[in-house]
From Swiss-Prot:
Stated name of the protein: Arginine-specific demethylase JMJ20
Cross-referenced PROSITE patterns: JMJC (PS51184)
Organism: Arabidopsis thaliana
Record-linked PANTHER family: 2-OXOGLUTARATE AND IRON-DEPENDENT OXYGENASE JMJD4, ARGININE DEMETHYLASE AND LYSYL-HYDROXYLASE JMJD
Boundaries of every JmjC domain copy: 115-287
GO molecular function, one term: cis-regulatory region sequence-specific DNA binding
Keyword Lyase among UniProt keywords: no
């Protein structure tokens, strides 16, 4: 059974695209696009590519060879994904370069946390179009899971950030999937060429079985019509991604990817105000699925909810408590930036209106999602809370806010501001929380954001 391709992904020159236009045309509308001319000055495109345009594997074996990486065996299916092997980069390069038989498996190095492992090697700089990245700026400063004892070391490494390097020979591929957390992703070809097939979100149900549990693995193999009765109705968009091009993958778009040549790519998953509702919807769905899967032990288990949260974190990458703390810290960080800007700039000529609008939109979006969380049941663990006094005096939080400020200054082409001292911030923000200065529930966070946005809207006339 062949697939029906009905169109191609739009292409655009990145140098002719402002952040505002990108946000309006692609982030807000959740539409894919191929973007050119944003990678020419990357170190990776110089160091990692041979003169003939192929991957410079010698560089990886020489400088990064001891790194332990996950490698997919593209010819072997294991449950719902390709079989994974662990090896060093040197071992991977040796197997790649010594492959002399068509009977040998095609290997694909995936999900290499290169930036986290080599922070002093600046292989590339994230383009401003993709810099409003709540996920990775948060994980640069905090662990996703507060209850660290409940998670194995591998889980901590795998959730340390969502910035990856992929390397694979011609014929390597990735099965049909939608991205983690239903996040956005961007993928830049350092060298090589890829073929992408995209399925629009309204058709997602057509690639699942009648129970919405199992997804089609490979859209080019013979798909079982009894198991996947809707698959024959799917219509696809296609894209051939050339070297140096970046593809933006929106939330909820299932896709399957083939390397048409030996390829190296850089890939980020990220989320922000434009797709936060996608993240929450998936998290709540996965929570209910987790709850249902162990329902038979509810009456005999004293810590049923804790088990649900632990299983959710293991399967989805974060649980409800992780998400609540993430949103609480990020909200407070936005408030700190807005308070600092409003105090230091007495008129809008000195402060970017676009930046203020961006920060207020962030808070308004989090508020809406917290309202959904309240309706759904919210956070139940009593120990999950954010103490404002402790947080505003915490050097780790101040580094987090500094990183946020640097990000938004870069996006909106503003000078980076110094924000207020912890003492000044406590004085300004103390009236926004309850008398105990704690955010203990989604309801507390909603009230705090409402109070803050009322005040800030008056300042910025937004």
């Amino acid at each position: 059974m062949g697939i029906q391709i009905i169109g191609q992904i739009e292409r655009i020159n990145g140098k002719e695209l402002s952040y505002g236009d990108f946000a309006e045309r692609y982030l807000a509308k959740n539409q894919p696009v191929v973007i050119s001319d944003l990678t020419e000055d990357w170190r990776a495109r110089e160091d990692w590519v041979s003169e003939n345009g192929n991957p410079n594997l010698h560089v990886f074996a020489t400088h990064f060879g001891k790194s332990r990486v996950q490698v997919a065996d593209c010819d072997t299916r294991e449950f719902t994904d390709q079989k994974r092997l662990e090896m060093s980069v040197t071992e991977f390069v040796e197997q790649w370069t010594n492959k002399d038989s068509i009977e040998e498996s095609v290997l694909y190095l995936k999900d290499w946390h290169f930036v986290k492992e080599y922070p002093d090697y600046t292989a590339y700089q994230t383009p401003p179009l993709f810099s409003d990245d709540w996920l990775n700026v948060y994980l640069d400063n905090y662990q996703m899971h507060e209850d660290r004892d409940s998670f194995q070391k591998y889980d901590q490494i795998s959730c340390s950030d969502y910035r990856f390097v992929y390397m694979g020979g011609k014929g390597s591929w990735t099965p049909l999937h939608a991205d983690v957390f239903r996040s956005y992703s961007w993928s830049a070809n350092v060298c090589g060429k890829k073929r992408w097939l995209f399925l629009p979100p309204p058709q997602s149900h057509l690639v699942y079985d009648r129970y919405m549990k199992n997804c089609v693995y490979d859209i080019f193999e013979e798909v079982n019509e009894t198991k996947f009765p809707g698959f024959k109705k799917t219509t696809w968009l296609e894209c051939i991604q050339e070297p140096g091009e970046i593809i933006f993958v929106p939330s909820g778009w299932h896709h399957q990817v083939y390397n048409l040549e030996d390829t190296i790519s850089i890939n980020h998953n990220w989320l922000n105000a434009y797709n936060l509702s996608w993240v929450w919807d998936l998290l709540w769905k996965d929570y209910k699925d987790t709850e249902e899967s162990i329902e038979d032990i509810r009456d005999i288990c004293d810590d049923f909810e804790a088990i649900c949260q632990r299983n959710l974190a293991a399967n989805t990458g974060m649980n409800l408590n992780d998400f609540f703390l993430f949103m609480s810290r990020f909200s407070l960080g936005n408030m700190v930036l807005l308070q600092s800007y409003s105090d230091k700039h007495k008129n809008l000529n000195s402060c970017s209106l676009a930046m203020a609008q961006n920060l207020l939109m962030n808070l308004s979006t989090i508020l809406k999602v917290m309202m959904k969380m309240i309706s759904a049941g919210g956070v139940t663990a009593e120990e999950v809370y954010l103490d404002l006094r402790e947080t505003l005096e915490d050097p780790q939080f101040l580094r987090f806010v500094r990183d946020m400020g640097r990000t938004y200054a870069r996006i909106h082409m503003e000078e980076e501001d110094q924000f207020l001292s912890s003492k000044e911030l406590l004085q300004k923000l103390s009236g926004l929380a309850g008398p105990n200065m704690q955010i203990c529930s989604p309801k507390d966070l909603v009230e705090m954001i409402n109070h803050h946005n009322t005040f800030s809207s008056q300042i910025y006339f937004i």
